Design a protein with these regions (language model features):
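Zn2+-dependent cytidine deaminase-like catalytic core
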Residues: 31-130
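Phosphate/diphosphate-binding glycine-rich loops and adjacent basic-rich segments that engage nucleotide
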Residues: 137-192
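Short beta-strand scaffold segments in enzyme catalytic cores
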Residues: 27-32, 153
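Residue-level signal for inorganic ion chemistry
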Residues: 10, 28, 75, 115, ...
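Short secondary-structure boundary segments
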Residues: 100, 194-195
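Short, basic/aromatic recognition patches
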Residues: 4-20
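Short, small/polar residue-rich loop motifs at catalytic or cofactor-binding pockets
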Residues: 23-26, 148-149
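Conserved small/polar residues in nucleotide/adenosyl-binding loops
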Residues: 202-209
Length: 211
């Protein structure tokens, strides 16, 4: 496997945190030593251990001299968790491959700079577009301090949103409905018109889908 393939695996891991990490980003990490994956992890919930620490903790052998693949630049500041760069240095990681640079002003290149200052080989921007897209909501908020808003509108081919009796349940297909549920799981709030509340109040949540 090459750098892109390992990063793609890290992306798959990161997506497991979808809906649980906000306002933090989704992050995945993979530890590779001598061509073998010896550890992997992701940021599972806001306030809990970050992906890098989870990946290092899961290692089946000493990670010293290994390569760490991570979808987002490792943090270098104290928050609810200690800096990930400290864990990387303590583990003796030889090389770090990063997908996205972290736009958070508390990081913003500082994490990578610290790693390089300690002699770690850092490769940047591997699958950057995919890694950036994964956290577009986080990137938007951290750089603008404004909420990321997504609008959903469903209507029939002739422009209707319901039958005149109000008896209609769905006008969208199963694929569209599942997509909406996945989107709801990603967002922290749902805004509707007042007329929707008495009709659909109990349904204004993310329902389970098979995807």
């Amino acid at each position: 496997m090459n750098d892109k393939e390992y990063m793609r695996l890290a992306l798959q891991l990161a997506k497991k945190g979808c809906g649980w990490t906000s306002p933090n980003p989704m992050v995945g990490a993979v530890v590779v030593k001598e061509g073998r994956i010896i550890g992997q992890g992701w940021h599972q919930r806001y306030g809990q251990a970050h992906a890098e620490r989870n990946a290092l903790a899961s290692c089946t052998e000493d990670p010293q001299g290994a390569t760490l693949y991570v979808t987002l630049e490792p943090c270098c500041h104290y928050g609810k968790q200690p800096p990930c760069v400290d864990a990387i240095l303590d583990a003796g990681i030889h090389r770090v491959v990063v997908g996205s640079a972290d736009p958070n002003p508390l990081v913003a290149g500082k994490g990578i700079a610290i790693l390089r200052a300690h002699g770690i080989d850092v490769t940047e921007n591997v699958l950057q577009e995919e890694c950036d897209a994964l956290n577009k909501v986080f990137f938007h908020y951290i750089t603008t301090k404004r909420p990321f808003v997504s609008m959903k509108y469903a209507m029939t081919m002739d422009g209707k949103i319901a039958t005149y009796t109000g008896a209609s349940k769905w006008i969208t297909g199963e694929i569209a409905r599942n997509h909406v549920q996945r989107q709801r799981h990603r967002f922290r709030g749902i805004m509707v018109g007042v007329g929707t509340i008495p009709v659909s109040y109990t349904h204004l949540r993310a329902h389970e889908t098979d995807q």
